[in-house]
Amino acid sequence: MELQTIPNNISLANGDSKGVQLTFKNIVYKVDNKKYKKLVKKQEKAKKKNDTESSTGDMNTGVSTTIEKELTILNNVSGVIEKGELVALMGPSGSGKSTLLDILAQRKSTGKITGQLLVNGKEIGEAYKKYCSYVTQEDVLLQTSTVFETLKFYADLKLPGVSEIEKIKRVEQIIEDIGLTKRTHSKIGGVLPGGILMKGLSGGEKRRVSIGCGLVTNPSLIFLDEPTSGLDSVAALQIMKTLLNLTLKGVTVICSIHQPRPEIFALFNKVMVIIKGKMIYSGSNILEYFESLGYPCPNNTNPADFCLDSAVEIGEGERYTEICNQWQKIWENELLNEIEYPPVNVEKPKTASWGYQYWILLGRTWKDFLRNQGNFVARVGTAVVTGLLFGVCFAGLKETEADVQKILGTIFFLITGLNLTPFAVISLFLSGRTLFNAERASKIYHSFPYYMAMVTVETLIVFLVALINAAICYLFAHLRWTAGHFFFAIMVYFFVHLLSDFMISTIANLTGTSDMTFAYGSGLSVIYMLFAGFYVPTNELPKSFGWLHWVNPLFYSFVSLVVNQFEDLPLECTRPNIPVGNSTIQIPCQFSNGNQVIEYYGIDDWTRGSSFGVVVAWTVFFFWTSYLALHFLNKEKR
C-alpha cells in the first residue's frame, strides 16, 4: 500500500503559498520521577530514626542509584515535516506520541523540554503560535451555539484587526471547507447542565466544527490529537478526507492516531513511528522500511496494525537501540537534502483587548442562558414557588408582639432559601469551567473578561430571582412595605443570593467535582444557618462559639433585615386581660416596640447600613476567591 504524495508546489485557495516547513531536532522531554520522591522521603525518615546515613544510597541524598530522579519520556526525537503534508504520528500507548504532538504545538506546560523547533529553518519564538492550531481529542463546544456562531466567536476573538465583513466571509469559507454548509445554523447540541438533551450535530460533525475552530486564523500547521477517536468508520473517514483537502491548500496537518483502518492509513503521505520515546521511522515508505528490517507485511493485513505490532516487537527486542541509531543516521543524511523555504514573517500575533473580549463573551453567555430554557424556567419557577410558599405560610402578619417570632422566621427562611438556591446550578458552574479550560488553553481570551461576562449575566438572574422571591413573600406576609424599607430588603436579599453564588462557585473551582462541591457547600451553609442569629441570639451564644457570628455572612444579612424591619417600629400588645378579684389586668408584653426586639437579640450595636456593608464586603471577598480559584487552579496541565 502506497501513501499519498502531495506535490510541494501546491498553492493556497487565495493564491498565497503560505505553507511552512516544520523541523524539530533532538527533542528531549523529562518529568520528575514520583517514585524517586517517595524514596527520598522514606530514606530521610529512616535517617532521622536511625541517625545514620543509608549505606545503599547516594552520599548526599541517600537515594538508591537504581531509581532515576527524572523519567525521560522523549529521547532525542528529530524530524522534518514539509508543507502540505498529512502526517500520522503513531506508536503504542505510552510511547510518547501525544507528548511529542503537545511539544510541537507548544502546549506542554509541565516537565523539562530541550531541543530545537524551527519554522522554515528559523527559530521564531512566541510568534510560532501564530502559525499553528491545535484540536483536542474531546470536542468541547458550547451546546446552545450554532455552527456559524461557534466559528464567528473564534473569529471575533482571534482576528481582532479584521473587519466584520471579512470575518463573516472567513467563517462561511471554513464552513464550506469542513462540509457543513447545510448545518450552518444548526445548534451544536448535547447534554445541557442539569441533564437536558438538546438535539444537534452528530459526533463526526462536532469534530469537524472543532477542526473549523482551528482554521479561523488560517494556520499553516494544524495538530490533532486522535481526530478519529470515538467516531464510527464512516465519520472517521469523512474527517480524514476533510483534513486531506486542507493539505491540498498548503496546510500541514499532523495527527496522533491509533490503529487507523486501511482506507484512512492510505490517506497519509508521511508516517512517523515512536516507540519508547524514540523515533524509529519517518517517511512515506514505511512498509518497505520495515521489510528491510526483517518485518514483511503479510497479505490481507491492515498496514497500520502491522506497523504498530512491528514497532512494539522492535521496542521489546534486542535490536531496539541498533534500529534507533540506524534511523538517526538516515535522518541526519536526509537533513542535508532538506528543502529550503524563505524565512517566515515573525510578526507577533494580535490579541483582542479585554474590553472587546468581555463584550463578545457577554453576548455568547446571554444567548446561552436564554436558550437553556430549562435552567431559566427552573430558577425563576423556584423563586415564584418558594415565594408563594413562604407568603402563604406567613400570610397576614401584623405589627404585633404576638407575631414577632413569625416575622423573624419569615426573614430568616427567606435568607436561607436564597443561600441554598445556588446548589441547584452547581452543574452550570462545572460545565462552564470545562469549556473555559479548553478555550483558555487555545489562547482565545483571558480569564478575567470571561469571568466578568459570567458574573454580569449571573448578577441579572440573581437580582430577578431575589426580587420575585422577596416581593411575593413581602406582599403576602405584610412585612414593612414602605418604599425605603422594601428597597433595602431587596438589596440585602440580592446580595445574600449573589455572595452564595460566589461561595459555591469558589468551592466548585477548588474541588472540581459536583459531589465535593455539594458536600463542602452544604456543610458550610448549615454552619452559617445555625449561627445566623435566629436560632440562638448573639448574647446567648457561648463565648467559645462567638466568633462564628462574626465570620458568618448570613448573620450580617439577618441583622440588617431585622433592624430594617423593627427599628423604631411600635408593636401592638394583643395579650388578653385576666381577672384579678373584681378587676382585670393585662398580661405585660415582652416587646412594646421593635427596638426591644433588636436589643433582645443582642444586635442593638449594629445599624442596618453597617451590617449591610459587611454583607457587601463578604460578597466582594467571595467574588475574588471565585475568580482566583478559576484563574490559578483551573489551568490545563499537559
From Swiss-Prot:
Keywords on record: ATP-binding, Membrane, Nucleotide-binding, Transmembrane, Transmembrane helix, Transport
Binding site for ATP: 91-98
Every ABC transmembrane type-2 domain range: 374-633
Similarity remark: Belongs to the ABC transporter superfamily. ABCG family. Eye pigment precursor importer (TC 3.A.1.204) subfamily.
Cited Pfam families: ABC2_membrane, ABC2_membrane_7, ABC_tran
SMART domains documented for this protein: AAA
Protein name in UniProt: ABC transporter G family member 12
Transmembrane segments: 376-396, 410-430, 459-479, 484-504, 516-536, 544-564, 612-632
GO molecular function: ABC-type transporter activity; ATP binding; ATP hydrolysis activity; ATPase-coupled transmembrane transporter activity
GO biological process, one term: sorocarp development
